[in-house]
Amino acid sequence: MFHALALFALAMNVAPDLEQRLARYKPVEMTFAAERFTPRERRLIDELIAACRDLESIYWRQNSPEDIPIYKSLPAGPLKRFLWINGSRYDQVDENKPFIGSTPMPPGRALYARSLTRDAIEAWVKAHPSRKKAIYDERTLVDANMKTTPYHVKYRQWLEPAARHLRNAAGFSDDKAFAEFLRMRAQALLDDNYYPSDLAWVKLKDPKFDIIFAPYETYLDDLLGVKTSYGAAVLIRNEEESRKLAAFQKYVPDIQDALPLPAEDRPSKKGHETPMEVMDTPFRAGDLRHGYQAVADNLPNDPRIHEKVGSKKIFFKNYMDARVDYVILPLGKRMMRADQATQASAEGYLTVVLMHEISHGLGPSFARRNGQQVDIREAIGPAFSGLEEAKADVTGMYALKWLVDRGALPKERLEEYYASYVAGIFRTVRFGTGEAHGRAEMMEFNFLSERGAITRDSSGRYAVDYGKMPEAFAALAKELLEIEATGDRARAEAWFARYDKMPSDLHAALDAQKDIPVDFDPLVPFREGVE
């Protein structure tokens, strides 16, 4: 029998096309070969997963806390599954519009009091400059009276058990450096000082087991664009694929120096550590679990870490395989000119994603405004997430051509890389511009089309002018890097306003591909849920 809240949810004008929305996601079994691991390693994995579950509970409270009792009360079925996929009642593929009820998504989610607006916050901070640091801190909540509460205080109920599980996991680790990192990260959960453990994390050397476990990304914050949400992923090293990436590491400092950006905005050897790991992930939580399924990450985001030791590039091999097999290649075959569609490949897409993640760690660390260094996220505001994703895409493609020109990548595969990039765009823009990656790639598509690098033929298929791609990428990389370097919010907003609308012909072409999923829904062999 339904709980009263579940009945209430079903009576709240649930979207009538719910099952069609759910069908946009291809259920994919994510396998886990338990027999590969020793009993101690299994205990380690179990403790890490238990810790991830605690962060899951926090994420829902940051995102849409009113949906927790509804989710928990619903029986298994389409509505419960779709709530889980999105982590809230807001459909990430439909510009974050509600599929339960009609209340619009609060731009600050539950990170700010709902009555607050960006203008009101900025005006208050201008009148109370001593409070700016606390208001703009990436790990504080802001109430209607502009009082701030640190995450480690607000969420202690879940952070304390999460820290305990991390310490337990450390006791089962045979890797002393990883065990020490886990203990340091456990402490960071309880005081919000992630800097020491982030340093230790980047310095880990080829760990067999690893974990993403922190409030890193700002995707939930559409108000100021600075508040982070908790995310987690248990990682197991894919040794064979990791070895293939080692060759890229030595080129990162030279790519940084080659960017179309003034020298004063290029940290000289930023990202020089650049560890790259190809991992399989059996369990994810929080912002890594819901909506857009990340196939790679570049972390941490702290520019102080980037300056000192670089950042870590992580590629989720089992998730990337699912996306390529079920979404990108099928979509490319339908949308692209036949001869170019066959050039798109899984390996080409992996290379494009690799360059994207490397490029998150390249470019300016801070914006320069009025002779001072300013945090880029703070300077750009809500447009930052889309801007940064676009910068990583475009700078990555610029860097890819640089590597080809120097013989680090085979020249004969350049067209394969470009075709794979464009096939990936068709997948990403289906998320709409309410999602950072979708907004970024919609802008990229329109800019490249304006430059004649992407065209549409009389049959409705899209074609890539390979000769025009390098110049177009160089021009766009220069624009995006300059926006970040100057922290010019108005320029960023005007740029997206000009380029982030989906053309009607592309909309119609994508509408005709509804039998191809927008993304996959990972089905993991471990218990998921929110407490």
Roles of regions detected by a PLM:
Residues Q62, A169-S173, G487:
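Secondary-structure edge/capping motif, primarily at the C-terminal ends of alpha-helices
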Residues D17-M30, E35-E47, A51, H128, ...:
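Fold-level signature of zinc-dependent metallopeptidase catalytic domains
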Residues L7-N13:
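Boundary at the C-terminal end of the N-terminal hydrophobic targeting segment
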Residues W60-K132, Y136, T140-L141, N145:
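N-terminal accessory alpha/beta regions
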Residues M397-A494, R498:
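Long, well-structured alpha-helical subdomains associated
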Residues M1-L7:
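Sec-dependent signal peptide recognition
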Residues V14-E95:
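N-terminal mature-domain "stem" immediately C-terminal to a signal peptide or N-terminal signal-anchor/transmembrane
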Residues A477-E531:
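Extended, compositionally biased alpha-helical segments that mediate assembly or anchoring
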